[in-house]
Amino acid sequence: MYKKYTIGTVISNKMNKTITVAVKNKAQHLRYKKIITKTNKYYAHDEHNQCYIGDIVKIRPYRPLSKKKRWILIERIIEK
């Protein structure tokens, strides 16, 4: 079973009711054993426009709301 939520950092809030969240994942390279950090960007729905750049937020998957928006904001963990 997969996790019900993901934690990331808000990198953009210029769209109305939409935030862009960067989620970092760390994995070890199979051959060279180096830790690699991969960053995924997700568009998330922010109903009340309450998030600002730099906030740490919790998001979860949701039904498609637009062409690219498939995540919804659960809560702000750390406010900047």
From Swiss-Prot:
Q: Among the record's GO biological process terms, what is one?
A: translation
One cellular component term (GO) for this entry is: chloroplast
Where is this protein localized, as stated in its record? Plastid, Chloroplast
The keyword ATP-binding appears for this protein: no
* A molecular-function term among this protein's GO annotations: structural constituent of ribosome
Q: Which UniProt keywords apply?
A: Chloroplast, Plastid, Ribonucleoprotein, Ribosomal protein, RNA-binding, rRNA-binding
Which InterPro entries does the entry mention? Answer: NA-bd_OB-fold, Ribosomal_uS17, Ribosomal_uS17_bact/chlr
| Pfam families per record | Ribosomal_S17
Major place of residence: plastid
Q: Which family does it belong to?
A: Belongs to the universal ribosomal protein uS17 family.
Physiological role? One of the primary rRNA binding proteins, it binds specifically to the 5'-end of 16S ribosomal RNA.
Task: Output the PANTHER family linked to this UniProt entry.
Answer: 40S RIBOSOMAL PROTEIN S11 FAMILY MEMBER, SMALL RIBOSOMAL SUBUNIT PROTEIN US17M
What HAMAP family does this protein's entry cite? Ribosomal_uS17_B
Subunit relationships: Part of the 30S ribosomal subunit.
Name of the molecule in the record: Small ribosomal subunit protein uS17c
